[in-house]
Amino acid sequence: MRKFFLFFLLACLSAAVAEAQPDFHAGFGGFGGAEPDFKDVNYAGDDLEAHRLDIYLPKTDGGSYKAVVAIYGSAWFSNNMKAITYFSLGKPLVEAGFAVICINHRSSGDAKYPAQIHDVKAAIRFIRANAAKFKIDASFIGITGFSSGGHLSSMAGVTNGLKDAEGEVGGNLTFSSEVNAVVDWFGPVDMSRMNKCETVNDEKSPEAALIGGAPKDNPEKVKEISPVSYVAKAEKLPKFLVVHGDADNVVPYCQSKFFSEELRKKGVLEEFITVPDGQHGPVTFNEDTYKKMTEFFKKEAGMK
């Protein structure tokens, strides 16, 4: 079942990228183009594939570049899909003048939550600690991701400054893991309402694998992994842009609707973009939504 889900997700993503970015071919899944400027950098000081990242820099001599961390979707089942993140989200950001950091993270098979958010925060601290080496202007670090990567991106935003979510992966604990802006692409954000927008999913669901048990038997863990649970009490929320297709048959469209309503109450929702007939990747990834993403990050970063 997990292999089928990953195949389905990759097929959807490949179709989406082909539709939205028809000008680059070869490499992963038939797509190619840029090679990272820094490849397979380990951000945790170990030898895990799950703790590697790639950095792509703009092809201009800008000295240092404000940055966006990008996270793949895999239903948390993969620990090594950073290569596709550039082609799904990173390319338009690099072209807009950002350094893009595509990260791996531990899968639900490697370790249960909160290992995944600890990895994300470790990568951000690592980038801040080594900003000069990688030509990054760490005064702005945004984050974006699709599907489960959207979940982790949103989680990074809603837990800004929350010590309990920090972890100690890779050290660099004197550096901040806070993010300055978030773009969530159809991420699951309320695990208590994943089944028909009303109830939890069953014990065979990806979120069950993430927490190591049936959601119905673990209400506190369900709350812990749901970004929507943190919004009301969060003290350092960045601005959010949320994108979701209303024909998504993997992550219910209502997930982003619920989340956006809570973000709006806190005054941190830039926009909730509904893509008519948008699926879990196809149609939702398009020239207009990419432009919305880059313009939002540029605005929050103070870039012209």
Regions found by a protein language model. Give the residues of each.
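N-terminal cap/lid segment of alpha/beta-hydrolase-fold proteins
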Residues: 21-63
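Mobile cap/lid helix-loop segments that gate and shape the active-site cleft of serine hydrolases
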Residues: 23, 27-35, 165, 170, ...
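Short beta-strand element of the alpha/beta-hydrolase
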Residues: 64-74
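Short amphipathic alpha-helix adjacent to the substrate-entry channel of hydrolases
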Residues: 82-101
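Alpha/beta-hydrolase active-site loop
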Residues: 112-132
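Primarily recognizes the serine-hydrolase "nucleophile elbow" in alpha/beta-hydrolase
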Residues: 125-197
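Short beta-strand/loop motif that positions the catalytic acidic residue
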Residues: 241-244, 248
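Catalytic histidine-centered segment of alpha/beta-hydrolase-like enzymes
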Residues: 278-287
